[in-house]
Amino acid sequence: MKRERLLPLIVATALFIENMDSTAIATSLPAIALDFGVEPVALKLALTTYMLALAVFIPVSGWVADRFGARPTFMVAIGVFLLGSIGCASADSLGALVAARFLQGMGGAMMVPVGRLVILRSIAKAQLVRALSWLTVPALLGPMMGPPLGGLITTYGNWRYIFLINIPMGLLGIFLAWRHIPLLLSEPKPLDVRGFLLSAIGLALTMFGFASLGRHLVSTELAAGCLLAGIAGLALYVLHARRHPHPL
């Protein structure tokens, strides 16, 4: 298979399992809540935690790929996502599920941007549009298949299998990445640690504030306080980035 087809399909494997998992869990929330003995609204914390992990770790994904290489970073990202999936499938409490979803988010935060970086750096510009089309179509199938698949599994099986079906596809993605994705190792710029912390805190608090307002995850006062603190953190990051020679 040609390179401009193979690489996008490998990356699309990771995007597929991430997008499918994110949408499939939504239809299983009542069943999960029943197993854990909590209100379904409390499980929105598991959804929010995943988004928080994405917001925190996506900004640093490019630096990690430059520092350690695109291939190992992509493979480890899928592995971390699979570990989170196993944690979700074996969770026996809301706290365990939230922690596992955060681990999934860490892996997902590296999979998506690093995978696209591989395509941009490995394929000639003349073939780039065609390559991205091979990436987009399979990746879009995940959100389409997620809800009906999640409902089917929850109705006729157990909601835990929603996370376990990620394992064979993820292992396939790791194998294909090991065989075909180039290393793409380059000399990274110094990591902007302060910028990373400011952006992580700002994005996490802002997203948590928006996600919590009106959803009864926490009190309205706490949600509003997180939102304001997050906006302040992002403002501090902008000021910091303007002065830093190598901003995040």
Which residues does each PLM region occupy?
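Hydrophobic transmembrane-helix bundles of small-molecule transporters
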Residues: 155-248
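Hydrophobic core positions of alpha-helical segments in small-molecule transporters
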Residues: 25, 45-49, 76, 99-100, ...
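Extracytoplasmic
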Residues: 3-61, 111, 146
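Primarily residues marking transmembrane-helix entry/exit sites
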Residues: 1-12, 94, 201, 241
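Extracellular/lumenal inter-transmembrane loop segments of multi-pass membrane transporters
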Residues: 31-42, 93, 154-158, 213-216
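Helix-loop-helix hairpins in multi-pass membrane proteins, especially solute transporters
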Residues: 58-195
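Hydrophobic residues within membrane-embedded alpha-helical segments of Major Facilitator Superfamily
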Residues: 13, 17, 24, 29, ...
